[in-house]
C-alpha cells in the first residue's frame, strides 16, 4: 500500500496490516514449498513435460529416480502448469466466533486467516474473491488480481466491527449455495460448523469446486478445563456464567462435542477437506500447512 494511503489508516489497522505483510514476506518456507514458478493454490500440473536437473529448493517429490540412477545426478520431472485457479473465500461472521478462552477470540483468528488468503493470492497473482456475511451485512469482492482492491479488502476486514451478539446470522448457521463463483475454484469456507444437514442442492453445487471447510477451534471446545473457578462471559447469552466442572458437566460437553463433530462430517464427508485451526496456534503456519496438504492431493 502506498505511503499516502497508509497514512490514512488508524495506527491499529496500519500495525496489523504491516505485521501480516511482513510475516508473508519473511516466511522463506512459503517460497521453498511453492517454488518461484507455480502457485501454492494450484499445486503441480498432472501432464508430464520433461526431465531437468534438480536444484536446491525444488520439490524432492518430483525427483525421477530412474533417470537419476542412470545418469548419476539428481533429475526431477517437470509438469505442465495447471490452468488458472480462482481463490474464493466465504467468511461467515457468526457471533459465536467472538468466543475465546485465551487472549484471542476465534473471530480474530478467522479474520487473520482470511487476510492471509487474500494477501497470498495477491502475491502469487491469482484472482481472489470474498463473500463476507453477517447478521447485518453482506459484502462481496468479485474475483480480481488488482492488488489495490485486495489490500483495501484486507483493511476492510481488519476494521470490520463484530456483529451484534443477540442477532444470530441465519445465513451463517444454514449455508446456501453461493452463485457467481467460477467452476473449479478453490473455495475456502471459513465459518462455524453449520446447523442441520446439507441439502441436495448444496451437495450438487459443492461438486463443482475444490471446497474446503475451515473452522477455528478453542481449547474449551475440545475439553472442559479443570479450573472453572473464575466467572466466564458467554457471548451468545450475553451474561456472566459460573460452572462447576463435575462429571455431569463433562458428560454434557462430550455429547455436545460428538454431535458437533457429526454435523461437521455431514457437511464435509472427505476428511482431507475438513480443516481445523487452533485459536492458540500460529494462523499463518496452519494456513500454509493446509494448502500444502491440498497440494499433495492433486
Feature locations, PLM:
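N-terminal juxtadomain amphipathic helix
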Residues: 60-62
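Exposed, interaction-prone extracellular/peripheral surfaces
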Residues: 1-40, 50-58, 67, 76-112, ...
